[in-house]
Amino acid sequence: MKNINPMKTHAWKKLQNHFFDVKNIYIKDFFCLDKNRFANFSVFFKDFMLIDFSKNRISSQTLKLLFQLAQECYLDDAIKNMFLGKIINKTENRPVLHVALRNRLNNKIILNNIDIMNEIQIELKKIKCFSESIIDGSWKGFTGKSISDVVNIGIGGSYLGPYMITEALKIYKNHLNIHYISNIDGTEISEVLKKINLETTIFLIASKSFSTDETISNANYLKKWCILKTNYKKYFSKHFFALCENIKTAINFGIKYENIFKFWDWVGGRYSLWSSSGLSIVLSIGFKNFESLLYGAYLMDQHFLHTKISKNIPIILALISIWYTNFFNTETEAIFPYDKYLHVLPEYLQQSYMESNGKSIDRNGKLVTWNTCPIIWGSTGTNGQHSFFQLLHQGTTMVPCDFIIPAISHNLINDHHKKLLSNFLAQTASLAFGNINKDIMNMNLKYSSENFIFSHKTYFGNKPSNSIFLKKITPISLGSLIALYEHKIFVQGVILNIFSFDQWGVELGKTVANNIYNNLFKKKKINVYDCSTIGLINLYKYWNRI
């Protein structure tokens, strides 16, 4: 990829001038100027998704300049390089090929003179055979009973992706109970162990390196606990499986080779749900539905790769986000799925965005002088309306939002979904248009009890949002939605000249934590850290009588 400072492009300078021309224009004015704004500022994807970006503080000229910015940053070349398997993760010297995992036409993808699609197909067949044997009951535990429960042990991408998908597609769930242990917190393990029968439970240890401290600490405890409780040394070989790249370490841990489902170093952790790391997804919804999930992502991949920039959904949404973070200086973006099945989506996207683009060093190794990644947060609607929407409507901070809803609900109870949709539409309209006209906004009303109350009930509007309208939540539509966000994040990283596929920012905390951990066992008082950390460590020891 080209290492271009975006602020030095011609488009960026034009955008700065353009910003001063449009910053005081209200969204309602854009609609008045263009009676076809909805049609002109929305894109259909296949027959199951519509992205409406008309309620943004942008004009056609804004988009034109943003497209020019993308071209000056050689975005098209970067996209092609990712799909071709070029090394774009420079700090780890790796290609980035999660798109290969959902290459449903099985086109050749050559890496180091090897067609990696052959390896992917072999692993998919293994996943298919294993998952079907668990689901149909032919796989037996150590006492000859079929499996009823699956425990996925993993953190970060080895947890958030699979958990988000299994929740989102719960309507497709079979009889198996899926549990997740992610945190290194004894409470989490204890609560899961209360729910399972060891005779009918399998454990999936999901860690790319098979060395993640939280995951391996939890796996070690469960390994010893299960053998102790069952008094059967062979329990481990019948009930424990590894999802990893580091096969040697998994074998040394005690996992049988045939119980290892592998993925590769060119699959980033937060993109690993498409790989064997998503085995818990397959066990929850079945292999055919998992294939549909992959197909949905593949459809978005093809759209991203082949669609012209003016109709390319991930590119458009990425550029609008850059417009807000760097010209309006917004600091957060919110994700609001109006469907309970998508309740984990904001947390999942929080990791996807912030671990990918939460960087302050550019691809030239220099400190950036522009904004990179907003803070991502969100909640399901309508719960959020009764929590923090007050700030969105009347606060001093502008928060660009994505609203997501299916037109067809899986659970038709009375007129609930119509009411849910009404709230969805009301929020996007109210945020955009408010409830008063510009003349009243600019008036200095004389004090009266009536005016006093009126001022507190005003909604100025002009708060931007995107509406993502799904026909229905299915494996295909969900796959497309997740891939859309993946590519949006990639586009932002390319244009903002940062590396989106590493996460060095998490390493320092791990190193310091290991050092502190070793000192927690020493009886003498600690004085090798700052006074705050020392005080907290010594109080911990006092309360625990160490």
From Swiss-Prot:
Keywords: Cytoplasm, Gluconeogenesis, Glycolysis, Isomerase. GO terms for biological process: gluconeogenesis; glucose 6-phosphate metabolic process; glycolytic process. InterPro entries: G6P_Isomerase, G6P_Isomerase_C, Phosphoglucose_isomerase_CS, SIS_dom_sf, SIS_PGI_1, SIS_PGI_2. Pfam families: PGI (PF00342). It comes from the Bacteria. The active site is at 355 (proton donor), 386, 510. It is found in: Cytoplasm. It catalyses: alpha-D-glucose 6-phosphate = beta-D-fructose 6-phosphate. One of its GO terms (cellular component) is cytosol. GO terms for molecular function: carbohydrate derivative binding; glucose-6-phosphate isomerase activity; monosaccharide binding. Its EC number is 5.3.1.9. Pathway: Carbohydrate biosynthesis; gluconeogenesis; Carbohydrate degradation; glycolysis; D-glyceraldehyde 3-phosphate and glycerone phosphate from D-glucose: step 2/4. Its main location: cytoplasm. Transmembrane segments: none annotated. The keyword Transit peptide does not apply. Belongs to the GPI family. Catalyzes the reversible isomerization of glucose-6-phosphate to fructose-6-phosphate. HAMAP family: G6P_isomerase (MF_00473). PANTHER family: GLUCOSE-6-PHOSPHATE ISOMERASE (PTHR11469:SF1). This is Glucose-6-phosphate isomerase. It comes from Buchnera aphidicola subsp. Cinara cedri (strain Cc). The lineage of its organism: Bacteria, Pseudomonadati, Pseudomonadota, Gammaproteobacteria, Enterobacterales.
